[in-house]
Amino acid sequence: MTPRRSLSSSDSNDKSPSVSVVAKKARSESVEGIEKKTTPGRVKKIRSEVCTTIVKAGEFDSVALRKVNSLPSPNSEKSDTKTEQEVTIIENSKIPEEVKEFGVCQEMIVSAKSNENEQIDNGDQEIGDQDDYEEDGDEEEEREVEKKSVDVKEINVAKENRVGGVEIKKFSQFQNRTSPSPSSVRKISPPVIKRATSVYSAPPNSTSSTDRFAEQEDNFTHSQSKLQSLVDLVMWRDVSRSTLVFGFGTFLIISSSYANDLNFSFISVVAYMGLIYLGLMFVLKSLIHRGMVEEERHKVVGVREEDVKRMLRLIMPYLNESLHQLRALFSGDPSTTLKMGVVLFVLARCGSSITLWNLAKFGFLGAFTIPKIFISYSTHFSAYGNFWMRRFRDAWESCNHKKAVALALFTLVWNLSSVTARVWAAFMLLVAFRYYQHKMIWTTDQADDDEDDNEEEEAEEEKEQVPPKHKRAPPHMMMPNKLKKIS
């Protein structure tokens, strides 16, 4: 039996790690020596020397030796056990130019079966030679070697995941038997190689615009739902819940009105609460949790960023809605400015007699009564307002001395009012004048639009009333020869 050299390629779907095979100078010389030598003992000796040189150089990562029982040959008369020793050598090397071009690794298999071009003696006649007894006991067992193979797998290697060249050599030894079939040889699991991969971590603020829009929409709907629940409570849409809240608040207001001996300051309240908390903490630490004071000193005490964000998420919807309403009230529109000017002036003049507690009481009662009453009886209030406005307008139009009455009223108010009231009155007169101008412009524009609409409607009606004129058909010309038939 003679060794042979063959090339093989693995499938592209092979799960083994990508490796590249580069034949070192010493290893290539050893393989050529194996092919040229005739005795297996000499071949084994050369292989052992090469392995010893590689071990000393530190060129490979791991050496694995194991013995595997092989199947007996069908032509043999005795069933002898067959041992297989495989030496796996994995080492990093440089990638040759040919391998870099095609991105694959080559595989070389040297076995005991030789081709016609490469034949060597099997060495069966030299088993009993006296020169082999000079070697060690390991070399005596190696004389019985009949087959020697060097397998190097060919694996497609992805260029982007290539880490380095890896060379694998396998040496197998069998006793006096033919080489087993590939199915009888147990495959060695490939070594696990961890490759350095670049991991890209996306920045925290790299969210897409759609995600941000969806989050904003969810927050907006959530805030709208909260405001809607508050409106339902104030407008008595849920009667049981509104009754409970209004009754409890009214009870607290009435009970606090009769408790005259609860006159205290804010500083006194804070001081008393601090004393109570201090006493509770002293009792808790000294009696209940004794010995835990030193451990808790190292704990971080303070407000975390998550707590602040949570509080802001709760407050922001109400704050944004309040700012939106305030922006509408202070928009600068003449009609809105007249209403807000009167309300703010009254609050400014009477604010000294209004305390925070009184404002809270009147605000609570007004929130549960005024909106409901106004919405329920808005038609009646508008009817009464239009009636009295019509009466005052008729009285003013029927007055013969309008200028004198207006001058007398202005002089009386101006002399009885303070400087602040005079400034406010001048400002309100200017706003009223602008409101009158806007109203007149709006009425004229509306009248022009109404006239244009009326003219268009009249033109359409005239078009519909006038019947369309039918065109007369031209007279037909008849030839005499076509009117009469020849009898």
From Swiss-Prot:
Basic and acidic residues compositional bias, start-end: 26-38
UniProt keywords, alphabetically: Endoplasmic reticulum, Membrane, Transmembrane, Transmembrane helix
InterPro entries: Reticulon, RTNLB17/18/21
Topology within the bilayer: Multi-pass membrane protein
CC terms in the record's Gene Ontology section: endoplasmic reticulum membrane
Biased composition (Low complexity): 1-22
Membrane-traversing stretches: 242-262, 264-284, 354-374, 413-433
Disordered: annotated segments: 1-43, 65-86, 113-149, 446-487
Domain Reticulon intervals: 230-419
Organism superkingdom: Eukaryota
Principal localisation: endoplasmic reticulum
Record's compositionally biased regions (Acidic residues): 118-143, 446-463
Subcellular location: Endoplasmic reticulum membrane
Record protein name field: Reticulon-like protein B21
Organism encoding this protein: Arabidopsis thaliana (Mouse-ear cress)
